[in-house]
Every structure is written in C-alpha cells, then in structure tokens.
Amino acid sequence: MKEEKSEKESKLKKRILQIIGTITVVCVLMITAGCGIMGMGSKSWIEKQVSDIEKVYPTENPEDLFEKFPIGFTIYQSRIIEENGKTYSIRLEMKGNKDIKKIEGEVKKVLLESKPYKETIVKESKVEYIKDKGLVLENPELVNELLPKNYFLFQKLKLNKDILKKLEVKEKGFSFETGRYNIKYLITNEEIDNYLGLNKEKVSFDINGEYSEIDKTYFHTIIIGKNTEIDFSEKVVEEEIDKENEE
C-alpha cells in the first residue's frame, strides 16, 4: 500500500511539474510575441523614444526651456578631467525655477580617488545663467577651474531623428524591468569637438532615457566618451506634475 501511495504521489508531482512547465513555455511565447508586436527594445523603437530629444537640442536660449517645460526643469552636467596625475569630476546642477524664471545652481570640482573610493570637493561656486552673458559664477576667480565653457552643449548641438538615423549604431539596450533604454552611436561632430576640446575625433555618443506609459515627462541623458571612458554627460529633466501638486 505504501509503495502504491508513493507511486501515485510521484505521478502527481510529475503531472504538476508538466503543467508548470507548459504554463512557463506559454508565458515565454506570449512575452516574446508581445515584444515582437510592440517592437520594444528594437533599434527603431528606441529611436522613436529618443526622437523628442530635438525638444531640447538645440535650445539656443536656455530661458526658452520655460516655455517647453512650464512647471520647471533641472540641468545636470558632469565632466571628467585629468590634472597632474589626478582625476576630477566637474559637476554642475542648475534648476529652472518657474516662479522667478531663473536658472540657478551650483558647480563643483570633485577629486576622485579609487583606493579606497573617495570623493572630495576641492572647489565650488554658485552659478547662474544670464542672457547674453551665459553661465556666470558667484566666485569669478574660479571660472577657469569650474567652467571650461560658459554655455550648455544643448545650446549648440542639433539633434533630431533624421540626424540620428544617419549615425553608426554601436550598441543598444532596453530593460523590461525598469523601462530604461539606451542607444550608443559613433559620431564626429564640430560642436562636440569645440565643447570638449577635441580635434575631429570619433567618439561614442549615448542617449539614455526611461519609458513609461503613464509618465511622459522629458528625461534624456547624453553621454560622450572616447573608447570606454565617459568624458562628459548632460541631462535635462522636466519637473513632474505630481511633484508640483504636492508642493
């Protein structure tokens, strides 16, 4: 009797495993089919997501961003530099305040150490964008160290879907879990050369973003680097409506 009961339990377990296996296969097929239908993660799908980058690139007068993003925005920049055998990050963060129509923030020079990893702020200053003057430091004596350029790259760099389609794609990626996507191009561009002090060099040019069916706020980061190194990044983020309502 015990052997018969054990045999029945064994058959039942096998049957359950078969059912689970069948369900798993069906789910995988459904997900694969769904991805094929939607094209999520494909080159054309990602390029469609980043096509609204022309909303910012170019914006010759940063104050025009208040018309594009009425509830405000934040601009981030990061630039990696080498000085006297040491590595520094120049980090700029400025907020577009919709109430006073000013773009203000801070810029810092941060020493990066690897063993152990450590960040030390060595220089910093408040900074403001002023029309016809560009980026202006509260501490002007630090301009050479903190502001390699007194304007944003998006003021000069023109990007749109037609331009991007002509570029060589190096790689692309999409996460179904987070909705984040990126596409990396190879590019030689005069405005990038001028901004980063390059000489007609081909560099990698990443565009990162995040897909959401609900949240359609503007969110793109561009990352420029030589080989695998990240030399510069710039991000413009539209303020979210929910945050505005909470305030």
Description of each model-found segment:
Residues 2-4, 12-40:
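Sec-dependent N-terminal signal peptides of Gram-positive bacterial secreted proteins and lipoproteins
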Residues 30-80:
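N-terminal leader/targeting segments and the immediate start of mature chains
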Residues 75-82, 110, 184-192:
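Generic short beta-strand segments
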Residues 80-85, 115-118, 190-200, 230-231:
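Flexible, membrane-facing loop/turn or short amphipathic-helix motifs
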Residues 93-148:
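An acidic-aromatic
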Residues 125-177:
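Flexible, processing/modification-adjacent segments and terminal tails
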Residues 159-211:
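Extended beta-strand-rich segments in extracellular/periplasmic secretory proteins, especially
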Residues 201-247:
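Acidic, serine/threonine-rich low-complexity disordered tracts
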